[in-house]
Amino acid sequence: MKLDDRKQKVLLAIVHDYIATAEPVGSRTIAKKYKLGVSPATIRNEMADLEEMGYIEQPHTSAGRIPSERGYRYYVDYLMKRQELSREEEELIRREYEAKVRDVGQVIQKTGQLLSQLTNYTAVVLSPQIESSRFKYIQLVSMHPSQAMVIVVMDNGIVHNRMIEVPESITCADMETISRVLNAKLRGLTMESIRLTLMKEIYFELARHKHILDLAMELIQDSLLHKVEDKIYLGGVFNMLNQPEFHDVEKVKTLLGILEQEKLLRDLITSGGSEEGVTVRIGGEIMHEDIRECSMVTAPYSVCGRKIGSLGVLGPTRMEYAKVVSVVDFMTKNLSQVLERIVRGTGR
């Protein structure tokens, strides 16, 4: 239900003041600070209506009011005006990304650090997802008579290096043959699509090279089909402890316990979000009882128009949504651009 203009102004004042001070807000405070052009008595009446409608609530120990989850949701959906990044903040992001522009892992790690630095909350970044990435090429490099390095490169810039044992009878020419066949058959395919049928094709392609067939099959199984979990990068873990909501020891223990659970964090950052753009989930919308007092702002990042990972910010429900949404949006777009440059090999 859409609120009338005066109720919107009162709700906006309560949200802004509570975000800034972490103190319940009274009618006199609103009348003095926000110049709404009405008396404290009128503001009290509007606050009573807002409370009855579920947009604000009264803490047990205070005469003031604070926004409810419903109030925050109304604010984010209808009242919030984004707080754009300063020129200095935008330049900081671009400068830091340019310094790490050739290494995907470092770029993702730096993203977590920047998100937490710019928001003063906890950042969660999911690395590019292996299962949805596409195979670019594989190369076998002889290191010793019985050892070789396998280099697997994905189209999102991820590079896997592994040392493997090889029979001494395998020559550099054999390794080139394996690399050539695998590259011809696998290039452009996702990890999900490299399955049994394709392995049969490769088997028949290399059947005349009996001495290298087993090695090729082993490479596909171990280097390409091996399940690799997407990494979670955290930034500013202890930022949340500076928030008044988390001065309670038990709440701190619960929060830190959650931040240690990678599977849970992976679910939190990937579930409930849109395929593009920024998603804001408030309190109970996160669907996890232990962090009902938190909100999460998330967005996917992409390469060449394909979603490959997600990033987000975890903070109290009293978070600065206007700033956080802008930071997440700006960084998502810049991260996508940087990863595309890495994939294309164009550097800066």
From Swiss-Prot:
What is the protein name stated in its UniProt record? Heat-inducible transcription repressor HrcA
User: Origin organism of this chain?
Assistant: Pelotomaculum thermopropionicum (strain DSM 13744 / JCM 10971 / SI)
Keyword annotations of the record: Repressor, Stress response, Transcription, Transcription regulation
Q: What is the lineage of its organism?
A: Bacteria, Bacillati, Bacillota, Clostridia, Eubacteriales
Q: Which HAMAP family match?
A: HrcA (MF_00081)
Q: What does this protein do?
A: Negative regulator of class I heat shock genes (grpE-dnaK-dnaJ and groELS operons). Prevents heat-shock induction of these operons.
Biological process terms from the Gene Ontology for this record are: negative regulation of DNA-templated transcription
Q: In which family does this protein belong, per the annotation? A: Belongs to the HrcA family.
Give the gene that encodes this protein.
Answer: hrcA
* Gene Ontology molecular function, alphabetical: DNA binding
A matching Pfam family: HrcA
Entries under InterPro entries matching the protein: GAF-like_dom_sf, HrcA, HrcA_C, WH-like_DNA-bd_sf, WH_DNA-bd_sf, WHTH_transcript_rep_HrcA_IDD
